Regions:
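Gly/Ser/Thr-rich active-site loops/lids in small-molecule metabolic enzymes
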Residues: 15, 19, 153-166
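Short, solvent-exposed loop/turn segments at secondary-structure boundaries
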Residues: 83-86, 148-152
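Active-site-proximal substrate-binding core of FAD-dependent oxidoreductases
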Residues: 144, 162-178
Length: 178
């Protein structure tokens, strides 16, 4: 993360350990989501997509349902993206307009759009996690896993945030701060 680098906890990260994620959140009626993704009320669907969605750039696409929206986007290796001359927003739009993806999102309203730099170096990216007044968690701490078949990050971010919160709570209750 920029924060941990600026705090002196780690040096610059090689581009082959980084990816950029571009995501849109598309609002849809829950009944439409259930019908299009063939899920029942209270269920969800998640898809990891490879192939044309990245035009040969390392990475992939994703779709996952929420109660009244669908999150859809791409994650692209930064070094491959830079060499390609494509932009992350162009590839994001290419994925969302793909003939298989666009019918799933048709008629929806764009609620959110965002980009995020993602660490993909796994254990090789982990570094010191604490400094005075600073506690690094989630992907900023290098808690990610991408083997191509398994992609994890949100669960590790949530778990590390919970562990950090418990540690801070304990330190505050024991007056062990300073």
């Amino acid at each position: 993360s920029f924060l941990s680098r600026d705090a002196g906890l780690r040096g610059p990260e090689p581009k082959n350990n980084l990816a950029v994620g571009v995501k849109s959140v598309i609002g849809l009626d829950p009944k439409v989501i259930e019908e299009r993704f063939q899920v029942k009320n209270g269920e969800g669907a998640a898809y990891a997509v490879v192939g044309d969605c990245t035009k040969g750039i390392g990475g992939g696409g994703f779709l996952y349902t929420n109660i009244d929206s669908v999150s859809a986007g791409v994650v692209l290796r930064l070094d491959d993206l830079e060499r390609s001359g494509e932009s992350s927003s162009q590839l994001h739009d290419h994925f969302l307009t793909h003939p298989v993806v666009s019918p799933l999102l048709a008629g929806g309203e764009l609620l959110e759009y965002g980009c995020h730099l993602v660490a993909e170096g796994g254990a090789s990216m982990q570094h010191d996690l604490v400094a005075p007044g600073l506690l690094i968690v989630g992907d900023a701490a290098g808690f990610t896993l991408n083997t191509g078949f398994t992609v994890r990050g949100m669960d590790l971010a949530a778990g590390s945030a919970l562990a950090a919160a418990k540690s801070v709570d304990l330190a505050l209750r024991n007056h062990d701060v300073g």
